Amino acid sequence: MFLAQEIIRKKRDGHALSDEEIRFFINGIRDNTISEGQIAALAMTIFFHDMTMPERVSLTMAMRDSGSVLDWKSLNLNGPIVDKHSTGGVGDVTSLMLGPMVAACGGYVPMISGRGLGHTGGTLDKLEAIPGFDIFPDDNRFREIIQDVGVAIIGQTSSLAPADKRFYATRDITATVDSIPLITGSILAKKLAEGLDALVMDVKVGSGAFMPTYELSEALAEAIVGVANGAGVRTTALLTDMNQVLASSAGNAVEVREAVQFLTGEYRNPRLFDVTMALCVEMLISGQLAKDDAEARAKLQAVLDNGKAAEVFGRMVAAQKGPSDFVENYDKYLPTAMLSKAVYADTEGFISAMDTRALGMAVVSMGGGRRQASDTIDYSVGFTDMARLGDSIDGQRPLAVIHAKDETSWQEAAKAVKAAIILDDKAPASTPSVYRRITE
């Protein structure tokens, strides 16, 4: 029998906790036998003293095991269970293409996603722009969709990693969110509860990233790869660029539209293509669906070219109660804003920098995200035709097209866009879409 205060004292004094001590504490969080004050105290000691790799693995596994873990064995699937997690960004719509692309190549992708957080958009919010789309199918239906379609994107249910929910709520109000072992545990507890064979992590770097510096993004990626592999799931991570909006759009309906256009080949933003392909390649290799980069890319390009990936997306939408002809008639179903017009810069020049975070917050301010959980979202608002770093801007080339609910909202967004995009008299050096691949 352990005492919570003795576990806190041990960590406070700089000692490593045992697997049993960590499990006792995490189960107590779940069962409400550990108080909020005790959770806060342990979180703060971990914040200051860090955790060893074995402690990090134990913490993650204990949080995963605080709820149900999905088991796919009974379905006798003929491919690997694989997924991707992103630390979040602006215009990061990769999940909507990646899931169907990997499923079309023989993987099974049971993606449990989140809502928007701060300046970052949420995959669930984007999908809810599709009329009727059900993000909470029951467990049996979720399994059926994975078996039949190969991919489903759903919200986190209360049975998955319940200890994390309470732990995170306390961290949020005690300035202990930005601790790498705690972030790692929180992310992976939910992902590992999916019963995965392989995982790829997309860790963003830059002005729209969750972590404020390249070094911290790198440290988080290395921690996640180390812990997930320690927990028995083949995992790699990519450090990808978030110094500009990733897609050509930012919002909900506008990003869904771009995802469909990407899958059908109607329009593919080159940076979005680079990042999506790179993540899919990792999933195919880790899932043993391809032996190397070249084979993986060839398979992925084939399912884009022959329409199979778009077909899988359409089947997923229909299986999750959206329209059965969504891919063919997306504009008929997606909401459109009352006012859509371009915003131009006040001067001419090349785009040298972008405050991606501020652009994400501008979408939230227009009603495209939540400031608090109870807010309702206006799925129609956002930006399209986003200019990119290095673009030459003048009276002919707008910074973006703003989709707003009225003139006042448009004016506020236009002011935010102009303030967030910096022009210079010479073009900046180009930045890669993918900085680094981390395998251990």
From Swiss-Prot:
Task: Give the pathway.
Answer: Pyrimidine metabolism; dTMP biosynthesis via salvage pathway; dTMP from thymine: step 1/2
Write out the GO cellular component annotations: cytosol
Q: Does the keyword Transcription regulation apply?
A: no
Alphabetized UniProt keyword annotations? Glycosyltransferase, Transferase
Q: Which domain of life is it from?
A: Bacteria
Question: Some GO term, biological process aspect, for this entry: which one?
Answer: thymidine metabolic process
Reactions catalysed, as given in the entry: thymidine + phosphate = 2-deoxy-alpha-D-ribose 1-phosphate + thymine
Q: What is its EC number?
A: 2.4.2.4
Task: Output the SUPFAM superfamilies linked to this UniProt entry.
Answer: Nucleoside phosphorylase/phosphoribosyltransferase catalytic domain, Nucleoside phosphorylase/phosphoribosyltransferase N-terminal domain, Pyrimidine nucleoside phosphorylase C-terminal domain
Molecular-function GO term, any one: thymidine phosphorylase activity
Top enzyme category:
transferase
Job of this protein: The enzymes which catalyze the reversible phosphorolysis of pyrimidine nucleosides are involved in the degradation of these compounds and in their utilization as carbon and energy sources, or in the rescue of pyrimidine bases for nucleotide synthesis.
Q: Which PANTHER family match?
A: THYMIDINE PHOSPHORYLASE (PTHR10515:SF0)
NCBIfam families from the xrefs?
Answer: PRK05820.1, T_phosphoryl, Y_phosphoryl
Q: How does it assemble?
A: Homodimer.
Q: Which family does it belong to?
A: Belongs to the thymidine/pyrimidine-nucleoside phosphorylase family.
UniProt protein name: Thymidine phosphorylase
Which organism is this protein's natural source? Answer: Salmonella schwarzengrund (strain CVM19633)
Q: Which gene encodes it?
A: deoA
